[in-house]
């Protein structure tokens, strides 16, 4: 009995003493450390500041921010993308949550919109995909089931199919839709994410997948999607070990049937310099594809060594097109109008030009960049796009090439505005990431993505089911195309290819409206 009493007393003393000793140890440690000022003045209790600071982003995202408040994407934009991918639905009730007092773009509606049967749309063949149906949704229970359906594809009418490189190369690219995946490299994304995207885009049809500057991987090809193969200043995928351009490797890539076009990346909206991939993401496989050393961070050159001015670049494009026999375009960020004048002037005088120009807005996404570049450098897409379109028309070049636009254009309304401002096609990256599970954790650059999307870590990637996510990608693309036809009908045109500047106005904060031509006149005069 005495032994039990002694043990009980010792246990009670331990219960009391251990927290006191632990508190004292933390107190002394905090008071003597030199890294954090708050902890030196407020030992122990000051730690709550850092705990709240750590969980603050999650609290704001899930509890405190309103539907239109967050950046780079609001809860409304995120949910619209996720719901259209999971349920293939864009329906809402009661009314818009848009703040109509703020300045912004609006689509002019027609007094007599087009009837459904008047729309120039191709609904064959049907697309076999999977959607979810909600059975019960309350505070403590959500029950839903998956259904296989045959969905309308919302392809462009055969008469409206867009052709890239029609008069310049032996193998032009025929496109039945206006929306595709923007550049995202394997290495920035994991193999499961890339595979799910490839399979989903192939299911949707009439679209494309841009490889990003990291080079072509087997995962891009795995699903069968049409590919635009991007070549950045690092020349990944088309380089020799010493970093020089390999014409043999380029020729080999150009013989792959899935590759429909090539794109030279001059710049990216979020980083108008060379790309960066942290060493933690550079696995053996990533290194092999890029022809670099594994485990070491990769920093691409800020620009191509192969050319340094418009004439040299246009000559390089001509050679790529001659060797590859496929369309070649450039990706740029609009900055100085004078530089655009110089480039387009050389195109006009020489008769040489790319088959397409991708304009990336400064608001575009990235796997890794510097704050100062992402926040400040380059023009936003809705400003840059009409400038480039207008200048191309001034130089008589607009009919000779296509324009791709990218930069937070992940809903049908924003895509329609971009088309009206001069785009022929729209690229989407982060919307595609949402459709394969991205939760906006904002840790793409760390290889610790909790959803298994922007990581090459096998343990984290197991979260992503390729077979399930491919359907969400497919549904998202179909929903975007359907939304574009809905908006076209409302604007009184029979296809979204007919959106033009006359269909859009910009409303100022004082309530007055500006026609787009007047809005951009000062930049291109």
UniProtKB/Swiss-Prot annotation:
GO cellular component, one term: plasma membrane
InterPro entries noted in UniProt: Aldolase_TIM, GltB, Glu_synthdom, YerD
N-terminal signal peptide: none
Membrane-topology annotation of the record: Single-pass membrane protein
Subcellular location: Cell membrane
Domain of life: Bacteria
Stored CDD domains: GltS_FMN (cd02808)
PANTHER family to which the protein is assigned, alphabetical: ARCHAEAL-TYPE GLUTAMATE SYNTHASE [NADPH]
Family affiliation: Belongs to the glutamate synthase family.
Descriptive protein name: Glutamate synthase large subunit-like protein YerD
């Amino acid at each position: 009995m005495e032994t039990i009493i002694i043990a009980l007393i010792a246990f009670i003393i331990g219960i009391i003493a251990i927290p006191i000793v632990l508190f004292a140890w933390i107190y002394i440690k905090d008071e003597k450390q030199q890294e954090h000022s708050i902890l030196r003045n407020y030992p122990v209790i000051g730690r709550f500041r850092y705990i709240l600071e750590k969980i603050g982003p999650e609290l704001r995202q899930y509890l405190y921010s309103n539907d239109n408040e967050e950046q780079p994407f609001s809860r409304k934009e995120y949910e619209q993308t996720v719901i259209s991918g999971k349920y293939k639905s864009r329906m809402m009730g009661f009314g818009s949550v848009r703040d109509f007092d703020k300045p912004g773009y609006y689509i002019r509606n027609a007094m007599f919109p087009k009837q459904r049967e008047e729309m120039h749309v191709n609904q064959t063949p049907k697309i076999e995909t999977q959607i979810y149906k909600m059975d019960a949704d309350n505070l403590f229970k959500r029950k839903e089931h998956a259904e296989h359906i045959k969905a309308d594809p919302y392809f462009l009418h055969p008469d409206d199919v867009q052709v890239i490189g029609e008069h310049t190369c032996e193998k032009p690219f025929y496109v039945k839709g206006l929306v595709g995946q923007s550049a995202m490299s394997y290495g920035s994304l994991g193999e499961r994410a890339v595979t799910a995207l490839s399979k989903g885009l192939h299911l949707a049809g009439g679209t494309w997948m841009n490889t990003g500057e990291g080079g072509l991987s087997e995962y891009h090809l795995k699903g069968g999607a049409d590919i635009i193969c991007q070549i950045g200043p690092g020349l990944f995928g088309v380089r020799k070990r010493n970093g020089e351009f390999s014409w043999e490797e380029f020729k080999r890539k150009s013989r792959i049937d899935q590759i429909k076009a090539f794109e030279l990346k001059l710049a990216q909206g979020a980083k108008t310099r060379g790309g960066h991939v942290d060493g933690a993401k550079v696995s053996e496989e990533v290194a092999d594809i890029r022809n670099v050393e594994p485990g070491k961070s990769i920093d691409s050159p800020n620009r191509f060594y192969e050319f340094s001015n418009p004439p040299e670049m246009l000559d390089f494009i001509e050679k790529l097109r001659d060797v590859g026999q496929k369309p070649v375009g450039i990706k740029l960020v609009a900055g100085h109008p004078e530089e655009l004048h110089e480039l387009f002037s050389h195109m006009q005088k020489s008769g040489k030009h790319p088959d397409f120009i991708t304009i990336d807005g400064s608001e575009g996404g990235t796997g890794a960049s510097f704050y100062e570049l992402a926040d400040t450098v380059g023009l936003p897409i809705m400003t840059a796009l009409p400038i480039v379109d207008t200048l191309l028309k001034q130089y008589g070049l607009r009919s000779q090439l296509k324009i791709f636009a990218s930069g937070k254009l992940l809903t049908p309304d924003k895509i329609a505005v971009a088309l009206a401002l001069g785009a022929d096609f729209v690229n989407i990256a982060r919307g595609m990431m949402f459709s394969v599970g991205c939760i906006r954790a904002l840790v793409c650059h760390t290889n610790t993505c909790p959803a298994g999307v922007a990581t090459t870590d096998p343990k984290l990637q197991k979260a992503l089911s390729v077979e399930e996510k491919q359907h969400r990608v497919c549904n998202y693309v179909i929903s975007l195309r359907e939304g574009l036809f809905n908006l076209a009908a409302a604007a009184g045109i029979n296809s979204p290819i007919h959106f033009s500047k006359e269909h859009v106005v910009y409303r100022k904060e004082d309530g007055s409206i500006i026609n787009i031509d007047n809005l951009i006149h000062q930049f291109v005069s």
